[in-house]
Regions:
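Hydrophobic membrane-insertion alpha-helices, especially the h-region
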Residues: 8-28
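Hydrophobic alpha-helical transmembrane segments of multipass integral membrane proteins
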Residues: 17-20, 55, 81
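Immediate post-signal-peptide N-terminus of mature secreted/exported proteins
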Residues: 29-75
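A ubiquitous short alpha-helical element
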Residues: 39-46, 94-100, 129
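C-terminal amphipathic alpha-helix
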Residues: 121-179
Length: 179
């Protein structure tokens, strides 16, 4: 008889304990929701790196282009990479946390200016500008890959290097656009 009472009490205490611990566990999970945000930012970073790699591949091919029409792929890759990076900047907390990439606007304008007159052969100085842009962008891409730490934070030293290289490339393209 006393074993039966002890068993009922144990079951009752087990149910009460379960009813107390289960909501506490749910509350803990809800409050530590930050992990998913980190995961989303890290996934967005991976997409952005992929878009930057696509742009790098098209910039590698750009100096071999014969005509302005061949630069359409560069223009598309620029748009995609720029769009993705802008979203990453917003997700990372704004331009105070992650630098924007102004060279993309200047490169896009440079390509559009070349294509303005329709399809034509590229001039030697335009090909040289594409080669120099490719070389400078390769350095930027190497930095960009290391921009986010494994915990989802922006690495400030890499961000500073990226900002410097972006400024140099933007100034170079601005100068070429004025010639």
């Amino acid at each position: 008889m006393w074993k039966q009472k002890l068993m009922r009490k144990a079951i009752l205490y087990g149910i009460v304990l379960l009813l107390i611990l289960w909501p506490l566990y749910s509350l803990k999970q809800m409050l530590t929701h930050r992990g998913e945000s980190h995961d989303a930012n890290h996934l967005l970073f991976q997409v952005s790196v992929f878009q930057m790699e696509v742009l790098k591949n098209y910039l590698d091919e750009a100096p071999q282009s014969k005509s302005t029409h061949d630069l359409d792929a560069v223009k598309q890759a620029l748009y995609s990479a720029s769009y993705t990076h802008e979203r990453l900047v917003l997700a990372a907390g704004g331009s105070e946390e992650l630098t924007g990439l102004s060279f993309m606007d200047h490169l896009s304008q440079f390509v559009q200016r070349m294509q303005l007159g329709g399809t034509r052969a590229l001039k030697p100085d335009e090909i040289q500008t594409l080669k120099e842009t490719r070389d400078q962008y390769d350095k930027m891409y190497d930095i960009y890959e290391k921009l986010m730490a494994s915990n989802g934070d922006i690495v400030s030293s890499q961000n500073a290097k990226l900002a410097e290289l972006d400024g140099d490339l933007a100034a170079f393209l601005r100068k070429k656009g004025l010639q």
